[in-house]
Design a protein with these regions (language model features):
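N-terminal accessory interaction module
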Residues: 1-57
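Short acidic capping loops at alpha-helix termini that bridge into adjacent secondary structure
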Residues: 138, 226-229
Length: 327
């Protein structure tokens, strides 16, 4: 099998034969293989079927604001674990520019323990209902691996299900989402949170993650969820070393070949602190923004972020200075 990575560009100097993909375009693709050296070929040499594989990221990148209602999340655990503080933070994220709120009641940081369903529901459903009651009308995503939690969240007003297990943890979750007709995000993770960072191994991390996500996307489609309702996340930091993370980020446009939009969740992750000399997670906004802009330049559709205001400002300036004709 050959893997096709569009070499994304943005800006006004677009050749006539360029292939448009969201706010970006490309004239060449990098052909990757498990057995042959990588090579770059013109996009015009692709078959119509190969060109049709690439997912459209939409007209503009979106920001997903992170709202953890947990006592133990890696960067903000305990900050928003009361209803009042969680609602206030959700409103603040929307005011700062969040297009989506992603609400989670179970930490999936390395080493985290499983949270019982009833506890997770008590941490999330009331917050979602209160946000809707307060007039928050942006899309709300429930970050969960469990069907019962997702069901309660959807009934409270959520409209997206984001599963870090890739819909492998709970067999009832995909059928629930199919029956409700809601969009989903499927993420790649190797192993369980308790042990996923203990010496993760891959043959080729980029292609292994692509293949795993391709299998999950096709499984979700087979379960009744339309392709146009699926977003894929390569799962930065979930069973991956720093080198694994960087290999994915360097060639993240490969994941357009899944035929769905790409979501990136790298905000405040440990590798940003390591490279950027920021041991405190709250000090990693500049590095998080840098990673986000690099991803947007490769056509990533959704950026999941803690520091929404900083990301919103940076993205606005990136679009104005680099991709203005398409803004």
């Amino acid at each position: 099998m050959r893997y096709l990575r569009p070499l994304m560009q943005a800006g006004p100097a677009r050749p006539r034969d360029a292939v448009a993909l969201g706010w970006c375009w490309f004239t060449h693709v990098e052909v990757l293989s498990r057995t042959e050296p990588a090579q770059v070929i013109p996009a015009k040499d692709l078959t119509p079927e190969e060109l049709a594989r690439f997912g459209d990221p939409g007209t503009a990148p979106q920001l997903m604001g992170i709202l953890n209602t947990t006592p133990d999340s890696f960067s903000d655990g305990g900050s928003f674990d009361t209803l009042e503080r969680a609602v206030a933070q959700g409103q603040a994220l929307v005011a700062a520019g969040a297009d989506i709120l992603d609400i989670g009641g179970e930490s999936t940081r390395p080493g985290a323990s499983l949270v019982p369903e009833d506890v997770e529901i008590s941490r999330t459903a009331p917050v979602i209902a209160a946000l809707r009651g307060a007039g928050v009308d942006v899309a709300i995503s429930i970050d969960t691996r469990k069907a019962a939690v997702a069901k309660a969240a959807l009934e409270a007003g959520a409209s997206i299900v984001n599963d870090v297990s890739g819909f492998t943890f709970d067999a009832d979750l995909a059928p629930l989402c199919a029956a409700r007709g809601v969009p989903v995000c499927v993420m790649h993770a190797q192993g369980e949170p308790q042990s996923m960072q203990k010496n993760p191994q891959y043959n080729n991390v980029l292609l292994d993650v692509f293949d795993a996500l391709h299998e999950r996307v096709e499984a979700l489609i087979a379960s009744g969820i339309p392709r146009e309702k699926i977003t894929a996340d390569p799962g930065i930091g979930f069973g991956k070393t720093q080198d694994h993370n960087l290999a994915i980020l360097n060639r993240i446009s490969l994941f357009h070949g899944l035929g769905v939009p790409i979501l990136l969740g790298a905000s405040r992750k440990r590798f940003i602190g390591s490279i950027g000399n920021a041991p405190n997670a709250q000090d990693r906004a500049p590095g998080s923004v840098a990673v986000a802009l690099a991803a947007i330049a490769q056509g990533v559709a959704i950026i999941r972020a803690h520091d929404v205001a900083e990301h919103a400002q940076a993205i606005a300036l990136w679009r104005a200075s680099v991709a203005h004709p398409f803004a």
